[in-house]
């Protein structure tokens, strides 16, 4: 009895909505008879549009459901080279193992470029190395702390036998990153604080280019200690013991609080942090 009452209420509501729609459109949409209801030409015309809209709505609902279950999706990341190698690749490997249908789009940026891309909504978030300068609505979270070393090749290995001052290295050729990177900015400040001029004899576009230049004795240069361990153990490069301590660096997650994150982006960040 209760179910019959609910059906009667529902049918009355549907009839009321149909009548209201006809009054609003000022035309007859339904032909009512003892045999049931049929559509008028105007009713068929409206139905074609409504059916298409309903189909698109159903497709949208299914896409949102799949996004929620991470059956597909897209995550765009701006990453500096060192951040990519120090932490991001390992985290993304784990993420892809669990969510293989989510597409990843990686942009290899310097830290300033990655931050600018985030400001411009070109990426969902950025993984970069310090130093970094941001303002709201951007926010950062430290993921990893590390230090760099001053390294040399076999030609200069005698310099690595005892602590040495940066002042004693002024006449040696330096390999460094080009201007416009956070690494170059950091070392410009480091040398300035120690009252030493810093003008690299060879400028590299990426950190990956710095290491082989050091190995082949084109100059001495700074390199992330975690990434240098293997080549140090192989005897290809040597770490100098500087009397003036190098600044500590961090790998940071930078997000933009002014934009909403998709389920895929939120899940990717969970894996990274």
Predicted regions mapped to residue ranges:
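Single conserved hydrophobic/aromatic residue that forms the stacking wall/gate
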Residues: 1-5, 9
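A late-sequence structural motif
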Residues: 87, 238-273
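Alpha-helical linker/hinge and terminal dimerization helices associated
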Residues: 24-25, 46-68
């Amino acid at each position: 009895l209760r179910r019959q009452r609910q059906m009667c209420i529902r049918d009355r509501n549907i009839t009321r909505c149909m009548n209201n729609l006809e009054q609003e459109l000022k035309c007859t949409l339904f032909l009512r008879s003892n045999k049931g209801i049929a559509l008028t030409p105007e009713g068929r015309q409206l139905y074609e549009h409504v059916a298409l809209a309903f189909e698109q709505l159903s497709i949208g609902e299914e896409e949102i459901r799949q996004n929620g279950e991470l059956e597909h999706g897209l995550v765009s990341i701006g990453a500096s080279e060192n951040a990519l190698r120090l932490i991001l690749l390992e985290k993304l490997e784990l993420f892809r193992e669990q969510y293989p249908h989510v597409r990843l789009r990686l942009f290899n940026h310097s830290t300033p470029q990655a931050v600018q891309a985030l400001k411009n909504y070109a990426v969902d978030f950025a993984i970069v190395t310090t130093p970094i300068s941001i303002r709201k609505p951007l926010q950062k979270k430290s993921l990893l702390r590390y230090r760099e070393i001053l390294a040399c090749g076999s030609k200069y290995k005698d310099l690595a036998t005892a602590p040495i001052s940066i002042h004693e290295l002024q006449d040696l050729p330096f390999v460094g990153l080009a201007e416009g990177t956070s690494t170059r900015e950091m070392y410009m400040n480091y040398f300035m604080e120690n009252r030493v001029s810093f003008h690299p004899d060879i400028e590299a576009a990426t950190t990956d280019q710095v290491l082989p230049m050091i190995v082949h004795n084109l100059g001495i240069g700074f390199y992330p200690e975690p990434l240098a361990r293997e080549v140090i153990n192989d005897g290809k490069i040597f770490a100098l013991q500087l009397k003036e301590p190098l600044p500590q660096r961090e790998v940071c997650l930078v997000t933009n609080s002014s934009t909403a994150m998709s389920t895929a982006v939120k899940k990717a960040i969970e894996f990274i942090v």
